[in-house]
């Protein structure tokens, strides 16, 4: 149900080189429970090619006897109009238990027809962002990427207006190097001049442990997933 708010405060200031934001809210106490307190601070420093930032949150949940503080430092570096590198370092502290994570991404668009990107993600088994954020799972290391080629220079006699060729991959383990299912796929998207589209996709998944379904339940912490492959054909009119 809903809870009354004792107070809420928001402050935002944006300048040419620095952005500052603060949010605070406190829930009212009820007859049989105490309200939660939420606080968030965002700082971002901008320059010509580099942006660096900080995000901090703190949540006090007295009913659960739980205090959660999260610190995140992030950056985005653009040496030119074609290349972008970004990343973040994260730390959560839940009742004095620390968790850590990081992500790094790279994107290169040398021309209008080609793009290539990669990402590296690491989250240990203690990091927890759930009090004032979201993390789909922890305890994993993943390398993921996409390479895409777009062809729009088709003959005038062609029935197609453009074609996209895409390679996707994701390699995963947990933080103890137990292999999790990894995936590879190739996709062809063909756009016709009558604005219908045809999509052809083939994919392959390796075998490995899956602990997302079980949520690491003590009696059955993971499922052994078999390898698999498949095809997909989709036509959109």
List the model feature ranges, each with a label.
Residues 9-12, 40-44, 72-76, 84-88, ...:
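Short, well-ordered alpha-helical packing segments
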Residues 33, 64-66, 131-132:
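Short, solvent-exposed loop/turn segments at secondary-structure boundaries
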Residues 16-19, 50, 83, 110, ...:
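Secondary-structure transition into beta-strands, especially the periplasmic turns and strand N-termini
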Residues 4, 88-237:
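Exposed, low-structure sequence patches enriched in small/polar residues
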Residues 13-15, 22-26, 56, 89, ...:
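Glycine-rich, histidine-containing beta strand-loop boundary motifs that form or position
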Residues 1-46, 152-156:
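Outer-membrane beta-barrel initiation region
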Residues 1-3, 29, 61-64, 68, ...:
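Beta-stranded membrane pore/translocator domains
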Residues 20, 38-93, 153-166, 232-237:
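Surface-exposed extracellular loop regions of Gram-negative outer-membrane beta-barrel proteins
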């Amino acid at each position: 149900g809903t809870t009354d708010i004792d107070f809420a405060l928001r402050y935002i200031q944006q300048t040419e080189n620095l952005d500052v934001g603060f949010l605070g809210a406190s829930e009212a106490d009820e007859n049989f429970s105490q309200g939660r307190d939420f606080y968030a601070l965002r700082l971002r420093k901008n320059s010509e090619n580099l942006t660096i930032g900080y995000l901090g949150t703190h949540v006090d949940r007295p009913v659960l006897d739980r205090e959660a503080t999260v610190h995140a430092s992030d950056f985005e570096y653009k040496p030119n109009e074609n290349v972008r590198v970004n990343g973040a370092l994260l730390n959560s502290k839940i009742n004095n238990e620390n968790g850590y994570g990081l992500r790094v991404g790279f994107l290169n668009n040398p021309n209008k027809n080609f793009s290539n990107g990669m990402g590296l993600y690491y989250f240990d088994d203690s990091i927890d962002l759930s009090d004032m954020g979201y993390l789909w799972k922890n305890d994993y290391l993943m390398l993921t990427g996409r390479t895409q080629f777009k062809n729009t220079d088709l003959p005038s006699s062609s029935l197609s207006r453009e074609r996209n060729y895409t390679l996707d991959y994701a390699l995963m383990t947990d933080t103890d190097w137990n292999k999790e299912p990894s995936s590879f796929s190739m996709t062809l998207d063909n756009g016709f001049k009558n604005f219908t589209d045809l999509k052809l996709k083939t994919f392959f998944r390796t075998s490995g442990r899956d602990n997302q379904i079980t949520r690491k339940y003590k009696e059955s912490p993971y499922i052994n997933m078999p390898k698999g492959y498949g095809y997909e054909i989709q036509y959109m009119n």
